[in-house]
UniProtKB/Swiss-Prot annotation:
Cross-referenced NCBIfam families: gatE_arch (TIGR00134), PRK04028.1 (NF003107)
Native source species: Pyrobaculum arsenaticum (strain DSM 13514 / JCM 11321 / PZ6)
An example Gene Ontology CC term for this record: cytoplasm
Pfam families the UniProt entry points to: GAD, GatB_N, GatB_Yqey
Name of the protein in question: Glutamyl-tRNA(Gln) amidotransferase subunit E
Gene name of the record: gatE
Amino acid sequence: MDYKALGLKTGLEIHIQLNTRRKLFCHCPPVLRDDEPHFRVERRLHISVSELGAVDPAVVWEVRKRRKYIYEGYRDTTCLVELDEEPPHMPDEEALTTAVAVAKMFNAKLFDEIYVMRKTVVDGSNVSGFQRTMLVAYGGRAKILGYDIGVETIALEEDAARKMGEEGKAVVYRLDRLGIPLIEIATEPMTYAPQQVEEVAWIIGYSVKITGRAKRGVGTVRQDVNVSIAGGAKTEIKGVPDLSLIPKVIEYEATRQLSLLKIAEELKRRGVEKVELSLADVTQAFANTKSKLVRRVLDAGGKVVAVKAPGFNKLLGAEVQPGRRFGTELADYVRAWTELGGLLHSDELPGYGITADEVRDVEARVGVNSFILLMGVDEGELEEAARVVVERLNAAPRGVPEETRAANPDGTTRFLRPRPGAARMYPETDLPPVRITFEILKKAEEVAKVTLEGKLKELTSRGLSRDLALQLVKSPHLEKFEDYLQRFKEVPPQQIAAVLLNISKALAREGVEITDEKVESVLDALNRKVITKEAVEEVLRNMKPGESAEEAAKRLGLLRMSYDEVKKIVAEVAAQVGKEKAVGEVMRRYRGKVDVEDVRRALAEIYL
């Protein structure tokens, strides 16, 4: 795919939990708990205008779902601030210092005074109905690893409550995560290829982690990706779970937008401008149906209704992403706005047990050959689903609607909610502005001294190539490497890195279980000069449970020969094959048991 010709633009929003002693707006500890909660409270959210007198479209969408929210908490680690029963405390200075330090890393412009804002969030993940956020800096730019990274904004905000599950129409959240400090770094639009965007995301995340002030583990970093192509629209894709998925998400979203533009072009060619909301009860067409899907609804007292989609013949089944069609997009809308499980459309029928005769019967009843079938018991839900479908059909001739979408595990995306409007953000009335003091700046400057480029320089100064140093930094083994450097001082840094990055990975691909204990035992044997570096892979491959590297080497006949033994062997081999071929021949005959440096030294001494 020629992304330049497509006019691909991407943006990143990287959210990283900070490792602080308290939450951002209260003094509760920022810990997640799995034990039984001490209490539960129930809340409902209601729509109202913001302090600016406007209503956000995303709010309208969420409130119409009429959900109840249940919050679980602990008396010793959650408080009234999380329950929105007490005003927020002043922001945590430790978190603010980290945000200022990150701003300095990216040469962003700091605000002298920071205002706490309320960002409307009505999916229940914030008890108050809004998330408190502070814009710390803007307009940053840094060149790191050859990438020119423009940073639009750096914000400090509170994380949302943790979703634990659903109970019917109620969503259950746990308050332990609510209020944990979160730094959000939003980039300027980029024209990099998808693979390069993944690299940029890693650079940003690592730049925060290297300060030692970021939390580690699953769920501590979240990536949102904004994607658009020429003629398309900005689409925000929430919750890309893994950096490696970013290229696929971008590729598939570009494909989706291109497909939607082609559908729009075809609709214009067909003269389709507007679809009228027309709902026809076609239950009788399925009176004798053998379709299990339809029969289940009818047996429950439900009915089947058809929504006319004139002009959409063969377009409802058009693929927009791998395994997803335009009809899937419509089904996403239905699932998002109602409790219905989805829909069927004429391009996929006959199918699902529905016969050609039943399809012809429906066509006769609605008067068109392209239609949407909705099934359910609740008439209100069916009417709402029909309205949503028609709205999305009417958006199709305009191309790509602005949406917030969610990432699927395979890199495709699904509709989540409409894009929020400007009415989403307004000032926090319970807190005064926060000044960036000289003390905060001084502390932040110290934190900002630790950089990615600085870490790479430190590693290359130890003898690692830049490529190997970068591999190590990108791996989860950097802390182990630094620990092993101190513990196994006789093992060259390059050898430690090779064991962690290359040998362990190659053996794991063979199905060999590699544990920290095995690696440490092998490095200890190397450190004591019990084995050679050539024997490492074979020893690791064949170590039995509970066996040390030295014991395994002895069993395998791979204990390192003493220097006197090596010298004797070198003299014998050199006499047989000559001085020039002696090193290679000794290594061939005794590989794994002799160290090449010992062989060279012995040869040099013999022929002095």
